[in-house]
């Protein structure tokens, strides 16, 4: 996703919250629960993508946590590590990632890393912290 696309998505979500009666400050804060500011999205790296199935979209559904009830999403979570992907913003890890649970957001980290992270139930921040500790001990 380009920076311009991220800006459009971010501004649209802020506008939706403003229309619901939130102040600008509140609307921006609520938007940041699920979207990063333009220029700060993992999508800009080419390593992250949002995956939802066609029936979900055709039913007029948005990117929402309830997507995790879909068989297609459950299959992705079960097999993602075989292809080097992780579920980037996992349920229960919101305080660590700073982003709400997103069952549609996947990030490529490589097969070996993905398998390790899945086995140990780590999000990227925790994995990086482990690597940094390992590297500091080897100095």
Regions from the language model: what does each represent?
Residues 1-138:
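Cell-envelope/glycan interface and biosynthesis
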């Amino acid at each position: 996703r380009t920076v311009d696309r991220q800006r459009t998505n971010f501004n649209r979500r802020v506008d939706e919250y403003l229309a619901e009666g939130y102040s600008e400050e509140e609307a921006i804060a609520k938007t940041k629960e699920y979207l990063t500011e333009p220029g700060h999205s993992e999508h800009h790296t080419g390593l992250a993508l949002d995956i939802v199935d066609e029936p979900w979209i055709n039913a007029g559904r948005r990117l929402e946590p309830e997507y995790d009830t879909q068989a297609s999403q459950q299959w992705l979570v079960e097999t993602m590590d075989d292809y080097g992907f992780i579920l980037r913003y996992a349920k229960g890890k919101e305080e660590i990632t700073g982003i709400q649970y997103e069952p549609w957001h996947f990030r490529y980290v490589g097969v070996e890393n993905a398998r390790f992270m899945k086995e140990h139930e780590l999000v990227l921040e925790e994995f990086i912290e482990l690597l940094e500790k390992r590297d500091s001990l080897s100095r």
